[in-house]
Amino acid sequence: MVDVIITGGGPTGLMLAGELRLHGVHVVVLEKEKEPSGHARALGLHVRSIEVMDQRGLLERFLALGRQYPLRGFFAGITRPAPGRLDTAHPYILGIPQNVTERLLAEHAIEAGTEVRRGCELAGLSQDDTGVTAELADGTRLRARYLVGCDGGRSIVRKLLGIGFPGEPARTEWLLAEA
């Protein structure tokens, strides 16, 4: 039995895995995709994420593969706070594609002792007084004390548990091109 199963090998799941390993927790990450994505998806890290990477000793890896952009002090037409007044040692946005972020976080989690299983899709789960049993699409079962769903907006964990997604979908459309 492992301590924690994390479903989802994106930035959230991989960062959580690394954090748990720092505390000696036995972690397995299940990612349904067989190979890492080659697509950018998201394009960068904001100040607080950069600060966390620095606190964990990971920032140099990110800086080596990203590009720093000065902060701009606006969001949805709001011009405050002024960037020069933010209390941070990192007054920039780091342009770095999500697939690179995921690779760096996976390397860190694996170096810390996390087992990352790719091509493993969660198909079912059951819970009792001693933990959780995860059933994978191939019929394999894995037992853990806890299971954490870090599997995104279309979360299979949330669906299996009957947890709704309250609120409304975003009304903003974006176009991202890799040219």
Predicted regions and their residues:
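A conserved short coil-to-beta-strand element within the FAD-binding core of flavoproteins
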Residues: R118-V132
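Flavin (primarily FAD) binding-site architecture
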Residues: G149-I163
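Short hydrophobic core segments
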Residues: T7, L142-G152
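Glycine-rich FAD pyrophosphate-binding loop
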Residues: R21-A42
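Core beta-strand elements of the Rossmann-like FAD/NAD(P) dinucleotide-binding domain
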Residues: V2, A137-Y146
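Glycine-rich loop(s) and the adjacent beta-strand/alpha-helix scaffold that form part
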Residues: L160-A179
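Active-site-adjacent segment of FAD-dependent monooxygenases/related oxidoreductases
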Residues: G38-I110, S126
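Beta1/beta-strand and adjacent pyrophosphate-binding region of the FAD-binding site
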Residues: M1-T12
